[in-house]
Curated annotation (Swiss-Prot):
The gene is purM. This is Phosphoribosylformylglycinamidine cyclo-ligase. The lineage of its organism: Bacteria, Pseudomonadati, Pseudomonadota, Betaproteobacteria, Neisseriales. Keywords: ATP-binding, Cytoplasm, Ligase, Nucleotide-binding, Purine biosynthesis. One of its GO terms (cellular component) is cytosol. The keyword Endoplasmic reticulum does not apply. GO terms for biological process: 'de novo' IMP biosynthetic process; adenine biosynthetic process. PANTHER family: TRIFUNCTIONAL PURINE BIOSYNTHETIC PROTEIN ADENOSINE-3, TRIFUNCTIONAL PURINE BIOSYNTHETIC PROTEIN ADENOSINE-3-RELATED. Pfam families: AIRS, AIRS_C. Belongs to the AIR synthase family. It comes from Neisseria meningitidis serogroup C / serotype 2a (strain ATCC 700532 / DSM 15464 / FAM18). It comes from the Bacteria.
Length: 344
């Protein structure tokens, strides 16, 4: 007679999954908002739209962390990639003026390492807490044979809300408007295939002091900055005409996504200093300047476009919220079919 088999024999440990859920409940609980009905663990999560909204529009976004995860595996650093995951989605929906309401995550692996997964999801909860977004559920998929031992993949899903009349579309952007840039916290979650290639080729001392007491390793793995609370504070007092979250495609490919077709963002490359991480990447990788601008954020994580008469006040308010803000340039009329973001 054949030996009796269990799900664990096939590589799926239900007890480990249950332990992970218990581990993360306290972290998720700290993220809760009054709109959330019920607790973690149901088949679906319930969220009501508050009565303060007259004509609410839901804004959704989904993203991952990309190959930055390969460095997390190689360096056994798992406590901040969850922040990256949240930031990539909530910063995206923020661009349209949405206040993030809730977030769900997908964690997939070949073999569930509970302490490691706990670190990851603790980071997700931290990102949610910092952005005022409720972590209302997720999926942990243990799939033997699908991923190498010690590796996993992440996906995140965010939903926010904005009054219909306050949706930011970029349509009102015109010549003379001011382009502001909010400083990034590093490379955020984009360009890591190139970063890894540069590290592999240059073989630097990752643990030597690199910038303001940080090692190069710390600079490379630093989590994506969350812009939610400062931007929402600015939206309470000022009209923001357009925003661009600087992700894959860098500055030159993301800013045009919010511009009317007849406009160009003319950005002065001297308006901010290229952070040391990007200086090193450019030199070590012999990366051309325009390739830098279309691959990395180059120190600018969020672009905000406002009327000229509001620029000083918006810059001051964001500064009071803890952001480093640069006046990058102006919006001008487009000439022919020129690219809609010019950095020079």
């Amino acid at each position: 007679m054949s030996t009796s088999l269990s799900y664990r024999d096939a590589g799926v440990d239900i007890d480990a999954g249950d332990q992970l859920v218990e581990n993360i409940k306290p972290f998720a609980k700290r993220t809760m908002r009054p709109e959330v009905l019920g607790d973690l663990g149901g088949f679906g999560a319930l969220v009501e739209i508050g009565k303060k909204y007259k004509n609410p529009v839901l804004v959704s976004g989904t993203d991952g962390v990309g190959t930055k995860l390969k460095l997390a595996f190689d360096w056994d650093k798992h406590d901040t990639v969850g922040i990256d995951l949240v930031a990539m989605s909530v910063n995206d929906i923020l661009v349209q003026g949405a206040e993030p309401l809730f977030f769900l995550d997908y964690f997939a692996c070949g073999e569930l390492d509970v302490p490691r997964a706990t670190d990851v999801i603790k980071g997700i909860a931290q990102g949610c807490e910092e952005s005022g977004c409720a972590l209302i559920g997720g999926e942990t998929a243990e799939m033997p044979g699908m991923y190498p031992v010690g590796e996993y993949d992440l996906a995140g899903f965010a939903v926010g809300v904005v009054e219909k009349e306050n949706v930011i579309t970029g349509r009102s952007i015109g010549a003379g408007d001011v382009v502001l840039g909010l400083a990034s916290n590093g490379a955020h979650s984009n360009g890591y295939s190139l970063i890894r290639k540069i590290i592999e080729r240059d073989n630097p001392d990752l643990d030597a002091e690199f910038d303001n007491g940080k090692t190069l390793r710390e600079a490379v793995i630093a989590p994506t900055r969350l812009y939610v609370k400062p931007i929402l504070a600015a939206l309470e007092k000022f009209t923001i005409k357009g925003m661009a979250h600087i992700t894959g495609g860098g500055i030159t490919e993301n800013v045009p996504r919010v511009l009317p077709e007849n406009t160009v963002a003319q950005i002065d490359a001297k308006s901010w200093e290229l952070p040391k991480l990007f200086q090193w990447l450019q030199k070590a990788g012999n990366v051309e300047t325009q390739e830098m601008y279309r691959t990395f954020n180059c120190g600018i994580g969020m672009v905000v476009i406002v009327a000229a008469e509001d620029a000083d006040a918006v810059q001051d308010l964001l500064g009071e919220q803890g952001e480093t803000v640069y006046r990058l340039g102006l919006i001008r009329e487009r000439q022919g079919d020129e690219h809609q973001t010019q950095v020079a």
